[in-house]
Amino acid sequence: MKETRYFYVPEAATQQELPEEEANHAVRVLRLQPGDEIMLMDGKGCFYRAEVTVAASHHCNYKIVETLPQERQWRGHLHLAMAPTKMMDRVEWFAEKATEIGFDELSMLDCQFSERRVVKKDRLDRIVVSAVKQSRKAWVPVVNEMMSFKQFIAQHTTGHRFIAHCYEEVPKVNLFEELQKISSSLSPLTSHPSPHTSDLSPLTSDLSPLLVLIGPEGDFSIDEVRMAVEAGFVSVDLGKSRLRTETAALSAVMMMQLAMQK
């Protein structure tokens, strides 16, 4: 029995043809033939069971057999913002693993002590999509362009916001404990509806986005921490261990996931 193959097609519901890169993989690598079953994922909360109708050298057509809306595995919008590491492969590792765990949005911060100020967003997008297909996630995380720390703080003024750092002179609380408090305050029925549905339950009104900031290897500057706290961010630690940037970022995603799982 053939394993069902998954393909990322953002407009799966309205298209009848795989995107060029996916089509080449389907036809040239997997050698799919008309009649073969495939699974499409639109990255917005829906899978589609489909059947290949045409498999040619440069294109692969399909017809949708069944639409399969997916249930969210967590509540709320999980957003991680980090200063990229000097070695880009460590950021790519984080993006892959965080996507496998599950989160909604990734932002890159240009901080005072940043070791890298240029990030190839298109490469991160490809890594995230690949991880989504591998882990069978229904939502593709958004990857944002890099932004200065000051500009980012100014643009993110609502929701549950946290900044993780190592400064002893700035009082901190534990991130996971704070997330658990938020989770316990929510209605047990609170859900995050699929973008494919228009029915917004009133129970979603208490579900503000979650945002955690992770600094570069040299940490945020003390001025950046104070700027964030003055803007309403909660000063937090991730526990007693001293972590590398990408490890801290992944730990924060895991904490958000654990606290907000349905």
Feature locations, PLM:
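N-terminal positively charged helical leader segments and presequences
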Residues: 1-70, 122, 184, 197
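A mid-sequence, solvent-exposed acidic-amphipathic segment
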Residues: 147-186, 210
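Intrinsic disorder/low-complexity segments
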Residues: 181-209
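Structured adenosyl-cofactor binding patch, chiefly the S-adenosyl-L-methionine
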Residues: 222-262
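Short, ordered loop/turn segments at secondary-structure junctions
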Residues: 67, 111-114, 240-241
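RNA substrate-binding interface of SAM-dependent RNA methyltransferases
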Residues: 71-166
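A C-terminal functional module that forms or caps the active site or interfaces directly
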Residues: 210-227
